[in-house]
Amino acid sequence: MFTRNLAGFAVVLALGACASAPADGPNLGRQVAPDEIAAWDTSIMPDGAGLPSGSGTAGQGASIYAQKCVACHGENGKGGTALALDAKGPIISINAAEKTIGNFWPYATTLFDYIRRAMPWQQPKTLTSDEVYALTAYVLVLNRVIGENDAMNATTLPRVRMPNRDGFILRFPDKM
């Protein structure tokens, strides 16, 4: 019994010594600067929290679209190799219509966030905030959600009411 207690005491003593020893390691990495974190923290909420400064109109977006988007999405958002960007009509049921931005997406801020993170497909995250606002405005005009002269920015974009905003059912409303 004494031997067993002695062995247990030795293990506890060894673990205690290891816990107080300085951590010697490969010293990899470095402290991340706040501006580096800010560059990666690009989340945009449906209410517009996180939207950057800048602005754009559909007219500006049309010229950017012609340069950077038409190859995949086609003229006026139709006929390209990628999904169509304009609404073909309201969604009556899950299978009744093709899901597009105008008839399915619940928030315009989600469109901005998606364009900013994922487009253009061959060079994602290369658009400026002004270009993203302009392209967002252009796509919203294609879907007849906003007027051609409406400017999109951090104030106006969250106010855009998407046609299908209320078309989603909360699965767990008590968790909201």
What are these regions (language model features)?
Residues 1-9:
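Bacterial N-terminal signal peptides that target proteins for export
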Residues 18-20:
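N-terminal Sec signal peptide cleavage junction
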Residues 27-64, 120-123:
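Electrostatic cytochrome c docking/interface patches
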Residues 30, 59-67, 78-79, 104-108, ...:
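Sequence context surrounding c-type heme c attachment/ligation sites in exported
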Residues 36, 57, 107, 111, ...:
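Stable alpha-helical elements in mature extracytoplasmic
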Residues 61, 65-75, 135-139:
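The canonical Cys-X-X-Cys-His
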Residues 78-116, 120:
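Gly/Gly-Pro-rich "capping" loops immediately C-terminal to redox-active cysteine motifs
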Residues 122-176:
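Flexible coil segments in periplasmic/lumen-exposed cytochrome c-class electron-transfer proteins
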